[in-house]
């Protein structure tokens, strides 16, 4: 116990001694070196043999000098600790070694440090030494030396007096994040730059999300969902930048034959002139399918004797009147394969 107190007392007395007492200072320095040398010899005798067969844990310790004398204006302690001490904690986790910043200048409060140094307690004896980093490893021999080597290589990066190196930049970003400035800056930065999200509200029909409205025009029809109606080919999904599919009555695939035109009353019923009017939206797919099936079956009924349709009724379906009535829509192709319209055999009676 007396030997443990002896060295701190010598160091405290040396620091408190006036520089004018040259010989006294020299004698104290020699005594301190002698005492430290004896401790080093005892440690060397204990470490004379290394047992690697039993693989017992050994303790390694090294003191790494911090170059404060060469670079007195650089804050090495702050760089080693990092924001809230996180840099030193991560360094210990990565290397598996215990690291402590000791020596003169290791405490922030200089008055408190001087008071503890003069107290003469053994645990504060390091305050009389030079500023250094104590690295301690407790592991099996092979792993212990490997950890120590790794720790020495990593601690060397923190002792470079560079304000703009990668370690310093990372610490500044971490400090900004901890202070909350990064979150507030990110909130201001995205104002007016957000990504527009398409509406996901379901439409009134059977389809999914409401597609973006096409340019205003007459006869433009947007598919309402993915259900395929009778007599029509499947409609591919509408993507951004792709033209809106054409209205009913125009072929969507080359070679597709358009169905015969419906009666004029059908256009008034579905409200094609109003574009996206309420009359069209209220119609369901069943109503559309029934009307479409009716108009496709009306071709063979032209020659049914029970109807007694006059010749004027056939003239109202002429292609010329179709084109003039609906000039905004594309006229269907001429059906030359059927040979045109024939007169009713009993129309003269």
UniProtKB/Swiss-Prot annotation:
Basic and acidic residues bias: start-end ranges: 340-349
Sample GO molecular function, one term: poly(U) RNA binding
Coiled-coil portions: none
Tissue specificity: Highly expressed in brain, lung, kidney and small intestine. Weakly expressed in placenta, liver, spleen, thymus, ovary and colon.
The organism's taxonomic lineage, starting at the top: Eukaryota, Metazoa, Chordata, Craniata, Vertebrata
Record family assignment: Belongs to the KHDRBS family.
InterPro entries attached to this UniProt entry: BBP-like (IPR045071), KH_1_KHDC4/BBP-like (IPR055256), KH_dom (IPR004087), KH_dom_type_1_sf (IPR036612), Qua1_dom (IPR032571), Sam68-YY (IPR032335)
GO BP field: mRNA processing; regulation of alternative mRNA splicing, via spliceosome
Cellular localization per UniProt: Nucleus
Subunit structure, interactors included: Self-associates to form homooligomers. Interacts with KHDRBS1/SAM68; heterooligomer formation of KHDRBS family proteins may modulate RNA substrate specificity. Interacts with RBMX. Interacts with SAFB, SFRS9 and YTHDC1. Interacts with FYN and PLCG1 (via SH3 domain). Interacts (phosphorylated) with FYN, GRB2, PLCG1 and RASA1 (via SH2 domain).
Entry protein name: KH domain-containing, RNA-binding, signal transduction-associated protein 2
Organism in which the protein naturally occurs: Homo sapiens (Human)
Reported function: RNA-binding protein that plays a role in the regulation of alternative splicing and influences mRNA splice site selection and exon inclusion. Binds both poly(A) and poly(U) homopolymers. Phosphorylation by PTK6 inhibits its RNA-binding ability. Induces an increased concentration-dependent incorporation of exon in CD44 pre-mRNA by direct binding to purine-rich exonic enhancer.
Pfam families, sorted: KH-I_KHDC4-BBP, Qua1, Sam68-YY
Keywords of this entry: Methylation, mRNA processing, Nucleus, Phosphoprotein, RNA-binding, SH3-binding, Transcription, Transcription regulation
Residue ranges constituting the KH domain according to the UniProt record: 65-135
Cross-referenced CDD domains: KH-I_KHDRBS2
């Amino acid at each position: 116990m007396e030997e443990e107190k002896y060295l701190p007392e010598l160091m405290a007395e040396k620091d408190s001694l006036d520089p004018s007492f040259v010989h006294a200072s020299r004698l104290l320095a020699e005594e301190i070196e002698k005492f430290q040398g004896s401790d080093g010899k005892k440690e060397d005798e204990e470490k004379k043999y290394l047992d690697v067969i039993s693989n017992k844990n050994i303790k390694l310790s090294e003191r790494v000098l911090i170059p404060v004398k060469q670079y007195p204006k650089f804050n090495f302690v702050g760089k080693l600790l990092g924001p809230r001490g996180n840099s030193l904690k991560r360094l210990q986790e990565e290397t598996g070694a215990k690291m402590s910043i000791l020596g003169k200048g290791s405490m922030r409060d200089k008055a408190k440090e001087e008071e503890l140094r003069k107290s003469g307690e053994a645990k504060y004896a390091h305050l009389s030494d030079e500023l250094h980093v104590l690295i301690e490893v407790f592991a099996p021999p092979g792993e212990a030396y490997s950890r120590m080597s790794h720790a020495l290589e990593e601690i060397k990066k923190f002792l470079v007096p560079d304000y703009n190196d990668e370690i310093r930049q990372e610490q500044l970003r971490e400090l900004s994040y901890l202070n909350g400035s990064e979150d507030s800056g990110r909130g201001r930065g995205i104002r007016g730059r957000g990504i527009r999200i398409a509406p996901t509200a379901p439409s009134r029909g059977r389809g999914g999300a409401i597609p973006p409205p096409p340019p205003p025009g007459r006869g433009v029809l947007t598919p309402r969902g993915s259900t395929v109606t009778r007599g029509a080919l499947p409609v591919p999904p509408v993507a951004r930048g792709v033209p809106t599919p054409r209205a009913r009555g125009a072929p969507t695939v080359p070679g597709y034959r358009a169905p015969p035109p419906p009666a004029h009353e059908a256009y008034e019923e579905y409200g094609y002139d109003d574009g996206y009017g309420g009359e069209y939206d209220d119609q369901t797919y069943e109503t559309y399918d029934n009307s479409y099936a009716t108009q496709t079956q009306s071709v063979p009924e032209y020659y049914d004797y029970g109807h007694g349709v006059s010749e004027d009724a056939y003239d109202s379906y002429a292609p010329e009147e179709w084109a003039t009535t609906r000039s905004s829509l594309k006229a269907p192709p001429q059906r030359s394969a059927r040979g045109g319209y024939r007169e009713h055999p009993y129309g003269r009676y």
